[in-house]
Amino acid sequence: MMQTSRTLHNLGSKAASSAAPYQTECVESHQEANGVHYGKFALGPLERGQGITVGNALRRVLLSNLEGTAVTAVRIAGVTHEFSTVPGVREDVMEILLNMKELVLRSNAPDTQVGRLVAQGPGEVTAEKLQLPSEVEVINPRHHIATLAEGAILEMEFMIGRGRGYRAVDYSDSKSMAIDFLQIDSVFMPVRKVNYTVEAARVGQSLEKDRLILEIWTNGSLTPQEALSQAARILVGLFSPLQEVSFDTPPEPRQAEDNQKNQIPIEELQLSVRAYNCLKRAQINTVADLLVYTEEDLLEIKNFGQKSAEEVVQALKNRLGLTLPRERSKT
């Protein structure tokens, strides 16, 4: 089945208010015999160099950031490990698990869903015989699962989850599910392949613009158009916070150093017992507390004499490079 579309879509966003909007054109769209959906898009005109920037960003997001649906674990009646066989079933358990892994599903349910299958031979079991929740749709209903002989029964239950990218079996997570569920590697990626090329675009008599050609292959759970739209929204959401970003100015190194010094307890000044006790009785516990005072103020502390004041001033200067004013400000 082959479709070619020439519809133009305006992709100028609110974020790009100062730049002229560019256009995207669906050059080709069709479904291949193996169920893969193909779409070819042209984006432009873009400023010189932006074709690679946009193409690379879209390709990365399309391949790794779009959510998809896949079978994550399977429980088969009478089976305790993946190296077993089911009586009357041509495929061994490993083959059945592989066939379940290749199911193409679509679901918007955020939580794990459970599907079931009860089939009796003889005959072929395909995906259309699966009992699925209303939120889940099978995209490849003719997909082969198993072949049953006369009188054979295949009964199984399977978990359906949503995710991104590829998720390998995590045996450390096996405690969260029943012991007879067999985990399988899950491929959530709805996009199977992305290619892009950049060519010169003519605007008037000039060829100083880029035209981005983007090819997208999906498994059918999303159309290439839907995948491109989702990828664009992800990128907009990723960059939009940077439009009004505000950075806290880090403190000047000297200021940070002074703040650190101010938090030093007066014990670090190694004062005489007399001077130390007088300061503590006056509720002076840190250097910050001490810097509030002048030399004149210190002399007003009970039992704090000129010698003790000079000792404090000298300790601050020698150990921390700090000084106290001699007198109160006249203002």
UniProtKB/Swiss-Prot annotation:
Region Alpha N-terminal domain (alpha-NTD): start-end pairs: 1-246
Gene Ontology molecular functions: DNA binding; DNA-directed RNA polymerase activity; protein dimerization activity
Enzyme superclass (EC): transferase
GO biological process: DNA-templated transcription
Reactions mediated catalytically: RNA(n) + a ribonucleoside 5'-triphosphate = RNA(n+1) + diphosphate
SMART domains registered for this protein in UniProt: RPOLD (SM00662)
Domain statement: The N-terminal domain is essential for RNAP assembly and basal transcription, whereas the C-terminal domain is involved in interaction with transcriptional regulators and with upstream promoter elements.
Protein keywords: DNA-directed RNA polymerase, Nucleotidyltransferase, Transcription, Transferase
Protein name (record): DNA-directed RNA polymerase subunit alpha
Organism for this UniProt entry: Synechococcus sp. (strain JA-3-3Ab) (Cyanobacteria bacterium Yellowstone A-Prime)
Subunit structure: In cyanobacteria the RNAP catalytic core is composed of 2 alpha, 1 beta, 1 beta', 1 gamma and 1 omega subunit. When a sigma factor is associated with the core the holoenzyme is formed, which can initiate transcription.
Primary role: DNA-dependent RNA polymerase catalyzes the transcription of DNA into RNA using the four ribonucleoside triphosphates as substrates.
Lineage start: Bacteria, Bacillati, Cyanobacteriota, Cyanophyceae, Synechococcales
Family: Belongs to the RNA polymerase alpha chain family.
Gene Ontology cellular component terms for the protein in this record: cytoplasm; DNA-directed RNA polymerase complex
The protein's Enzyme Commission number: 2.7.7.6
Region (Alpha C-terminal domain (alpha-CTD)) location: 256-331
